[in-house]
């Protein structure tokens, strides 16, 4: 008996160091394959998302992420934070930090996490909060083990799976598990799985996906979003719950009906005095469009944007009467208020869900709770009018790049309808510049510039008339014309024409020492006010398609008076480049011996092009930049 126990003790003594070493090696950075470190700032060593659907209104989510951070740029790939609200109960929250050799150097429990409000600027009240750790590394690499478990009653949002979180992060293993013991009907949407070695062992009611040994992907300029290139999984229940409100939807029609009935009805009541005021405002208007414009401008004057996101209020608008009384609301509340005002005069309009900012579509073939913003749709007999209700300054019917050119969900009493917002593409995004320039024999320049912008170019400008004189001057000298040294702005006049959706800038300025002396002669760059500077990065082996996000057209005319005692022997020849990406055309004209005229047209076409076209596009951009820096010699008489 003693001999038996002695052998066990000896075996334990022998195995213990091996066990300790294996535990350390598990998180040691040297334990990863070399290929996973290539082009990587961080490595997903092991990421597990395990979801258990316990009921239509009860779901448990367990997540464990093991991330090795290789350098400073990889810190953002290893966040230790979790968002929650009154509908979420966090049952487990922990983190551990390991050094390069796999030795534990920090250990955090739930009580060690900071707990702060997730309220953004412009939000009055919200129940959204964040628990997070603030960790400052002293050495690289290091490994983070972050683990959470939480419960929620909202099953309208099943966690999605993005096995590759972005560029410059490799994946040793990423796993997604969904357990559905009640066999509730589920729908999935898989994107780009065919381009990656994703293992799928799912069954009709339970899901299991794994991605292993995926090398890091390098970002490329002028490319598609990583969401369009990398694998992703979307999951939704037909029967779901949102903040205590149950629903059913297997298509957009059903979803729209549910949203209209459960979240949007009975919220458009207004007091009698407001109704009378609205009717009085539009009494002389002849068309519904005129009435809608008058009411929209009334709404803009009366309200301002303030976020209101507590409970179902994150999705259900606050009543129109409340917005009318307090003068503020979030996107849902202000959109709903505008709809209520239009209802007073019998103009049909509908709440519309949209993904704002980044150009992203509501997914047509995956009915579910989507979008992060709400706008208003006026059908207008098939000529849709779209209203952004959170801005006090944007023109009637203009969306700008915040919500243009994307699929949206229009919620009607009969159900949801997918529509597409207006496109501001190519020639609709125009900028016309007319400059009168005078050069002096001392090398200085004075000019009067008129610039008119439309489309998305207008969208980038119309806020300028709210800037102070000092900030405006800094905007022109440090941003618009930062390539010109010694620029002094003498006078600025801005005109925002909301009727034509055009913005006009009239500027008088001077530039000291603009002209360069060259022996007895002088040299100057003829393109003073609109030089192209965006030359795409060179890639020896381009991997992804070329994407031009926005098309535009710029037209410039400069009339230049030469300095006394100088002339131009010969003007440069006309240059014209036309290809699938656009047009670049510059022309030179001698008006008389003291005056020349310079005309320039540059257009770019929105589109997605094969990766093989990237080199040609880069060459096009380089030629534009070259000719935009063209110098002309002034010869002394």
Can you name each region flagged by the protein language model?
Residues 1-26:
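Bacterial Sec-dependent N-terminal signal peptides
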